[in-house]
């Protein structure tokens, strides 16, 4: 349907658009990793008694049908059950349903069909008993209005057997800024998931980690867009390949004589809406069809602008789940604040709600930016900053510091030098090595471009000497350069005079341990000011001089 519409365009831009689409090889995983669902067809229908008893006929081919009334009204069917409270968890082929009646808790599947779980749940209750904004596979909350009952009744009979679904994401724990050494930091991906597939597991003792349940994951992509380090990224295809596809699409469009290209990122799930939008938009609007809108991040948006695009739009709907709208709006607002600093219209990157097309055309930006950088290399942040620096140079933007919103993953770290003991707790938890030691002397150093504002360093500092400030430093050299936040002369060992630790740390330890039974004597207190080798030598010399002293503690 979409291809047919695009082929009908006869304008020069329309022909260039079709040439670009036909001559750009889409990069996708041919054999992606998958997860499998096993469904025997045991179906649970939840809702008011009168309603659920009426809709069993279209599902007569299912292995079994169990009815669960939520209004307590009497019914006529023998497979009808009642409950005061209901708890549902799971996914296609593995729905656990626990009900409580008169204070007694029961596994409904065991009571109704002699198994542990149901395979499919058709939920006719008004608000739905599972809260995920994007329903898990096998769960049909038609009482909430989507999907429609007719569509659910048509699909449910097909859900018997074994089904494979792609693993949409890759997780690289080494890049994750969520937790380190018992300290919790970034939780952007957990907050961004509308399907309930991500969670933080662990404890302060064992450490926390991000877990992705592949059976719940629906491939929405908000987590990948929100992740500042690319620890979690979309895999069908991966972000770098998507970016290359957009860059080559634009190159082919220009090669065919097209002008002022506008990239319209569309979801493959809503082809009819995409067609409606393209019917009213000009022929220089090029659709880029992806699985989900949020799977394409801010780095790809700006990569399009530095490769000839005059604007990047998202073909969105106000019927999308609230979390998807929130994350997309949050990221686009961030991009628009950067565009404003560059002196570009904020609509250069914008969300086009398809419902608004009834009211008129959106603001279209068609001023060429004069950049064609080609493939951008590096990780997500490196690609983004390459694009931003190129735009800043071309547009003669002021190399100043721009304050950003509190949620921004860009910024600086400030250190109160009078409180810092250079213990390096912050360095130990920093996931990107934005904070790092000097190596040859006691010093804390910082690279602003690498800081993701995860807050781990601030929480880990025992002296509360650090603070984080979200901002973007448009001075490339200053942003990429190494800054010394705090530096001291090293303390020298009292015996061998070897530099071995920051003087402030030695002073702090002597102050805190003075009066402790193990450091009651001046000699014992002085050992804190010795290097590790001399400390041992001094202890054994004291023991040799007075062997009974060690028994007095």
Roles of regions detected by a PLM:
Residues 1-21, 201-204, 208-245:
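Helix-enriched interaction subdomains in cytosolic or periplasmic regions
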Residues 1-64, 68-192, 196, 260-272, ...:
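Ferredoxin-type iron-sulfur electron-transfer modules and their immediate structural context
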Residues 197-203, 225, 231-237, 438-439, ...:
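Short Cys/His-rich "knuckle" micro-motifs
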Residues 204-210, 440-445, 483-487, 507-528:
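Short linker/helix segments within small regulatory modules
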Residues 214-217, 221, 448-454, 521-537:
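Cysteine-rich micro-motifs
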Residues 260-294:
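Mobile, glycine- and charge-enriched loop segments
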Residues 285, 291, 310, 316, ...:
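Long, compositionally biased charged/polar accessory segments in the mid-to-C-terminal portions
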Residues 286, 309-310, 317, 327-353:
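Long C-terminal interaction/binding lobes of large macromolecular proteins
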């Amino acid at each position: 349907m979409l291809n047919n519409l695009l082929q009908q365009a006869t304008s020069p831009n329309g022909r260039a658009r079709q040439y670009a689409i036909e001559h750009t090889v889409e990069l996708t995983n041919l054999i992606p990793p998958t997860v499998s669902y096993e469904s025997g067809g045991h179906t649970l229908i939840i809702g008011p008694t009168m309603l659920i008893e009426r809709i069993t006929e279209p599902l007569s081919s299912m292995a079994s049908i169990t009815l669960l009334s939520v209004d307590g009204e009497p019914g006529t069917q023998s497979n009808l059950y009642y409950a005061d409270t209901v708890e549902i968890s799971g996914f296609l082929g593995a729905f656990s349903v626990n009900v409580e009646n008169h204070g007694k808790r029961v596994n409904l599947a065991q009571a109704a069909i002699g198994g542990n779980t149901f395979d499919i749940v058709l939920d006719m209750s008004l608000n739905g008993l599972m809260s995920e904004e994007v329903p898990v596979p096998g769960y049909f909350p038609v009482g909430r209005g989507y999907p429609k009952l007719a569509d659910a009744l048509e699909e449910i009979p097909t859900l018997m057997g074994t089904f494979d679904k792609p693993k949409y994401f890759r997780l690289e724990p080494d890049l994750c800024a969520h937790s380190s050494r018992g300290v919790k930091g970034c939780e952007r991906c957990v907050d961004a998931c509308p399907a309930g597939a991500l969670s933080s597991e662990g404890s302060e003792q064992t450490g926390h980690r991000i877990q992705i349940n592949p059976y719940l994951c629906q491939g929405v992509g908000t987590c990948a867009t929100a992740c500042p380090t690319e620890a979690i990224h979309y895999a069908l295809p991966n972000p770098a390949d998507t970016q290359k596809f957009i860059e080559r699409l634009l190159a082919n469009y220009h090669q065919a004589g097209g002008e002022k290209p506008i990239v319209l990122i569309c979801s493959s799930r809503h082809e009819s809406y995409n067609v409606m939008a393209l019917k009213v938009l000009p022929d220089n609007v090029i659709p880029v069809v992806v699985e989900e809108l949020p799977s394409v991040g801010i780095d790809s948006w700006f990569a399009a602008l530095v490769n000839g695009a005059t604007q990047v739009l998202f073909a969105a709907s106000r019927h999308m789940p609230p979390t998807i709208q929130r994350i997309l709006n949050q990221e686009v607002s961030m991009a628009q604040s950067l565009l404003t600093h560059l002196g570009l219209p904020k609509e250069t990157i914008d969300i086009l709600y398809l419902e608004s097309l009834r009211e008129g055309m959106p603001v279209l930006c068609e001023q060429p930016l004069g950049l064609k950088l080609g493939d951008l290399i590096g990780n997500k942040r490196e690609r983004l900053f390459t694009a931003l620096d190129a735009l800043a140079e071309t547009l003669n933007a002021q190399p100043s510091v721009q304050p950003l919103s509190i949620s921004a993953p860009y910024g600086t770290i400030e250190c109160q030098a009078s409180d810092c003991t250079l213990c390096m707790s912050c360095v130990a938890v920093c996931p990107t090595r934005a904070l790092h030691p000097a190596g040859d002397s006691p010093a804390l150093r910082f690279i602003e471009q690498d800081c993701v504002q995860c807050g781990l360093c601030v929480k880990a500092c025992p002296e509360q000497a650090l603070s984080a400030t979200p901002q973007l430093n448009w001075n490339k050299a200053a942003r990429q350069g190494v800054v010394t936040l705090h530096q001291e002369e090293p303390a020298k060992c009292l015996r061998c005079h070897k530099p071995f630790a920051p003087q402030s740390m030695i002073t702090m330890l002597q102050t805190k341990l003075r009066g402790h039974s193990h450091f009651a004597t001046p000699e014992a207190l002085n050992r804190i000011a010795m290097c590790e080798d001399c400390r041992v030598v001094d202890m054994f010399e004291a023991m040799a001089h007075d062997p009974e002293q060690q028994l007095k503690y």
